[in-house]
Structure formats: structure tokens, C-alpha cells
Amino acid sequence: MINPLLRPLLTEKSTGLTEKKGQYVFVVKPDADKTDIKKAVEKKFGVEVKSIRTINCLGKSRAQNTRKGRVTGKKSDWKKAIITLEKGQSIDYYSNTAQKSEG
């Protein structure tokens, strides 16, 4: 698979995971598996991945009333990956580089 990583997911909860546990959250392609995600993270950021958890998120249903009646639709399903790195490693989302701390 060609680069399953779409973008980092920056929310209050994901930022808390990064600060407290050193876990990073990415939105990935729905058909990506853990081995593809691991290879992509290690190649792009130059870090060692300890573990990966993936979550399939269902898109929300939407409805709108119009002159012709009720129109329903659905947002796309998506997938996120929570990535835990080895001790002493971190990812800087903005510079696309990894940093290793001494110790």
C-alpha cells in the first residue's frame, strides 16, 4: 500500500495521549492494516514503533428537510491508528522529523 497515513489527528484527547503516554494518533486509509501503518511511520519519521491500535469510526448519518421531502445521507467511514513509540522517541508533527532524547 502506498502511504496509508493521511494526517495526524489533533484533538484534546489525542494531544493528552501524546503528552501523558507518548502515543500519537493518525487518520489512516480505511483499508490499511497494522503492518502497512507501522512501515509507513517508521519510514516517514525514522522512529521505532512499539505497538499500534486501530479503530474503525463510522460516519455520521445526516438528514435534511427540503421541499421535496426528507433527504438523508451519510458521511464517509474513516479509520484512526493510535501509535505507541519505543521509550525516548517522539514525533514532531509540524517538521516531519523524529527526535530521540538521551537517557
UniProtKB/Swiss-Prot annotation:
**UniProt-listed InterPro entries:** Nucleotide-bd_a/b_plait_sf (IPR012677), Ribosomal_uL23-like (IPR013025), Ribosomal_uL23/eL15/eS24_sf (IPR012678)
Which GO BP terms sit in this record?
A: translation
Show the GO MF annotations. rRNA binding; structural constituent of ribosome
- What SUPFAM superfamilies does this protein's entry cite? Ribosomal proteins S24e, L23 and L15e
Identify the GO cellular component terms for this protein.
ribonucleoprotein complex; ribosome
Pfam families tied to this protein: Ribosomal_L23
Keyword Repeat annotated: no
Claim: Ribonucleoprotein is one of the keywords in the record: yes
Listed Gene3D superfamilies? 3.30.70.330
Question: What keywords are assigned to this protein?
Answer: Ribonucleoprotein, Ribosomal protein, RNA-binding, rRNA-binding
**Family, similarity comment:** Belongs to the universal ribosomal protein uL23 family.
- Classification via HAMAP family: Ribosomal_uL23_B
* Subunit description: Part of the 50S ribosomal subunit. Contacts protein L29, and trigger factor when it is bound to the ribosome.
**What's the stated role of this polypeptide?**
One of the early assembly proteins it binds 23S rRNA. One of the proteins that surrounds the polypeptide exit tunnel on the outside of the ribosome. Forms the main docking site for trigger factor binding to the ribosome.
Q: What is this protein called?
A: Large ribosomal subunit protein uL23
- The species this protein belongs to is Pelodictyon phaeoclathratiforme (strain DSM 5477 / BU-1)
